Structures are given as structure tokens and as C-alpha cells.
From Swiss-Prot:
It comes from Streptococcus equi subsp. zooepidemicus (strain MGCS10565). The gene is tyrS. ATP binds at residue 232. It catalyses: tRNA(Tyr) + L-tyrosine + ATP = L-tyrosyl-tRNA(Tyr) + AMP + diphosphate + H(+). This is Tyrosine--tRNA ligase. One of its GO terms (cellular component) is cytosol. Homodimer. GO terms for biological process: tyrosyl-tRNA aminoacylation.
Length: 418
């Protein structure tokens, strides 16, 4: 199958401007294409990964990617389907975030090898060189207000109010396409389905200003089987930066994907062939309780984003915590694996008697309950059962001289830090 057919088979094509013409272009020669990433945070997240990996698939098929960091559009803010105006960031912040996003993109696209090696561009480079008057005369005149207001991405905001700044965003994104076409012969833009309105503004500008045809292809916004927006864990984004979301947290996210999503996500987020995925699906459906699809998904994506060593560490943390083998893990590994459990900073004046500490740290609700928990064998200190009511914590109980892990019952953990 050709690359477009593969993208479709993987569920990666949501909408195109002219499918027949796009398929013809992709099968007859090398296509230069771009995907834009606005620096709205200091890291990309899993939601961005769909477009990034789609871009990589096209590169592997011989086409040339341009990764556009929106240093200028990031200063404005995209209003698409947003309920309220974005908070404007400072130029210094956007510049810093732009650099970090550039570094992350370098992990996924090949910027070094072959005639189709990826190139990084920043739209601040051209927007900083064009005057407001020139922009209105040379670009703005090609867009009617009626056309701009008809976009689904802004209709909702028209009712509640939208600033001229954000209203002009689609014109800026449209100009990106024009600029990249003029300088690099870029003829295809790839983005999320929520970007359709902004992206087709680019094909409109190309047609009117340069009498050229541009293509747009959107990838779907991923939701889980319940319709919940993908890439969030308990309201928090799953970031690609290991400092913001540890490899262990990312591993757990994939491991806990619902059965009805697992195979679909293997097609979208991994480079396993469709035949390999079909074989995994057959095994998975025969014994879903073994969670083969989720385990494969976790392995492939964590390795892709963070590397083999990070995957092996995440796997080891998972296995050791499941076995209760706390002492087999370093303090750094425990901080990853127990990042979401209550943490108590031990104070100099705190009593180190275990009964007192269980209450002080909020592990047991009262001294009476703490004593009962100890006597009943429900308390574990660094993975080992403790029943001595007179036991006092010492430096010997500190893993790497940094922390102590206490468990009450099977699942209630607390971390003491010093």
C-alpha cells in the first residue's frame, strides 16, 4: 500500500482538501510538507505526538518535513474552539519555550540525513520583518471578514467575544503556508482536526496571492472509548519532557489504556507494522486479562519518547512496587514510582516513634488505630512488615539518606522525606 493508504489504515486521516490530488502528489514524487507547533508551554505533550509521528511516517516514505515553531503565532494565541482568550506570554517566555520545543522535535524527525532531512523554521523570522501596513495591504486584503467569521473554529467565540488579536490568528497561519511555499516549495500542511479553519486559510491565500494549489490533511483529535480527550491523566497533560512527566508515569498511562482503545492506539502511536499489530490483536483478544496490547503500547511509546533505558527503568519500578520490594529501588526511582502518593516532610521536632509518626504523617487517623495497624501486621516499612510498637525510625531506614516508604494495608502509601 502507498503511504496515504497506510495513514488511512492507521486511522490518521481525518480530512483533506482534495484527496485525489493529494494521493497523486504523494505517489508521483517528493512532497515538502509542514506541521506547526505553537509554544504554548515549555514542552509538547501526547496530543502533539499524533501529528509528529504522522510527519515522521511521511518522512520515512521519502517526503520532506518542515517543523514550524510558532514563535510569532505563539505570541498571539490560537482561538480555535477555545472558550476564552488565551493569556499572552512575554516574548522572553515564548522564545525559551520555542527553543525547548525545537529540541524535542529533534528526537522524532531526522534532521541530519538524506535529501529529505527535516528542517526547523520559526515564523517569528518572517513576521518580525514585515510591517503592520505591509501585512494589511499584502495579506489582509485577501481575506474577507465574512470568510473569517464563517470558520467553525471562531464561531463560538464570536458570541462571547473575541479580540482582534486572536481573530487575526488565522490570517497569520495562512501566511505561514504562503511563506513556506514561496521559500521551500511546501505544498502540504498537516495538523489537528481543530486546525482545519486556520489551515484552509493558507490554501486560500496561496490560491489568491500566488495562483497555486496547496493541500491540507488533518489528523483526528484522539479521544478514548468514553469520548474523553486523550493525553490527560486525572486532569494533567502527559508531557514529552521527562522532568514534567516521568517515563514511569508515561508507562503507567499507556498500561492503563482501556481494552477498546489499545489496538487502535498501537496503529496511531507506534511504528509496528500493521501485520505485527494484527498478530498482537489476535493474541490480545484471546486473553485480554494479560494486557498484551497495553504492555506493547507502553514499551513502544516510552522507548520512542525516552529511550530503551528509561523504558527498562519504568518496567523495573512497576515490577518492584507490585512485589513490594521497596529496597530494590533507588530514591530517584521511588520518587518516580510514588510521585502521586502523600509526602510528609519530617520536622526536627517530630517524634520518630513509629506510632507517633503514623499519626503525624497522616497514615493512621489516631494513635489507637496506629497501634492496631502495627499489631495486625498492616504496616510496612520500606517493604518489610513492622509490628514493634516501640520502634523508632533511624538513619538506617532512609533510602539513599533521602526518604522512607511506609505502606498501610495493600495500597495506602506515604513517603517520608528528610
Amino acid at each position: 500500500m502507498n503511504i496515504f493508504e497506510e495513514l488511512k489504515a492507521r486511522g490518521l486521516v481525518f480530512q483533506t482538501t482534495d484527496e485525489e490530488a493529494l494521493v497523486k502528489a504523494l505517489t508521483e514524487g517528493q512532497v515538502s510538507y509542514y506541521t506547526g507547533y505553537d509554544p504554548t508551554a515549555d514542552s509538547l505533550h501526547l496530543g502533539h505526538l499524533v501529528a509528529i509521528l504522522t510527519s515522521r511516517r511521511l518522512q520515512l516514505a521519502g517526503h520532506k518535513p518542515y517543523a514550524l515553531v510558532g514563535g510569532a503565532t505563539g505570541l498571539i494565541g490560537d482561538p480555535s474552539f477555545k472558550d476564552a482568550e488565551r493569556i499572552l506570554q512575554t516574548k522572553e517566555t515564548v522564545l525559551d519555550w520555542s527553543q525547548k520545543i525545537k529540541e524535542q522535535l529533534s528526537c522524532f524527525l531526522d534532521f541530519d540525513n538524506g535529501e529529505n532531512k527535516a528542517e526547523l523554521v520559526n515564523n517569528y523570522d518572517w513576521f518580525s520583518q514585515i510591517s503592520f501596513i505591509d501585512f494589511l495591504r499584502d495579506v489582509g486584503k485577501h481575506f474577507t471578514v465574512n470568510y473569517m467569521m464563517s470558520k467553525d473554529s471562531v464561531k463560538k467565540r464570536i458570541e462571547t467575544g473575541i479580540s482582534y488579536t486572536e481573530f487575526a490568528y488565522q490570517v497569520m497561519q495562512g501566511y505561514d503556508f504562503y511563506e513556506l511555499n514561496a521559500k521551500h516549495n511546501v505544498t502540504l500542511q498537516i495538523g489537528g482536526s481543530d486546525q482545519w479553519g486556520n489551515m484552509t486559510a493558507g490554501t486560500e491565500l496561496l490560491r489568491k496571492k500566488a495562483d497555486k494549489t496547496g493541500h491540507v490533511m488533518t489528523v483526528p483529535l484522539i479521544t478514548d472509548a468514553t469520548g474523553k480527550k486523550f493525553g490527560k491523566s486525572e486532569g494533567n497533560a502527559i508531557w514529552l519532557d521527562a522532568k514534567k512527566t516521568s517515563p514511569y508515569e508515561m508507562y503507567q498511562f499507556w498500561l492503563n489504556v482501556m481494552d477498546d482503545d489499545a489496538v487502535r492506539f498501537l496503529k496511531i502511536f507506534t511504528f509496528l507494522s500493521l501485520d505485527e499489530i494484527a498478530a498482537i490483536e489476535e493474541q490480545f483478544n484471546a486473553a485480554r486479562h494479560e494486557r498484551l496490547a497495553q504492555k506493547t503500547l507502553a514499551r513502544e511509546v516510552v522507548t520512542l519518547v525516552h529511550g530503551e533505558a528509561a523504558y527498562q527503568q519504568a518496567l523495573n519500578i512497576t515490577e518492584q512496587l507490585f512485589a513490594g520490594a521497596i529496597k530494590n529501588l533507588s530514591a530517584a526511582e521511588l520518587k518516580q514510582g510514588l510521585s502521586n502518593v502523600p509526602n510528609y516532610q519530617v520536622q526536627a521536632e517530630d517524634s520518630l516513634n513509629i506510632v507517633d509518626m503514623l499519626v503525624t504523617a497522616g497514615i493512621s487517623p489516631s494513635k489507637r488505630q496506629a497501634r492496631e495497624d502495627l499489631q495486625n501486621g498492616a504496616i510496612y516499612l520500606n517493604g518489610e512488615r513492622l509490628q514493634d510498637l516501640d520502634y523508632s525510625l533511624s538513619t538506617a531506614d532512609r533510602i539513599d539518606n533521602q526518604l522512607t516508604v511506609i505502606r498501610r494495608g495493600k495500597k495506602k502509601y506515604a513517603v517520608l522525606t528528610y
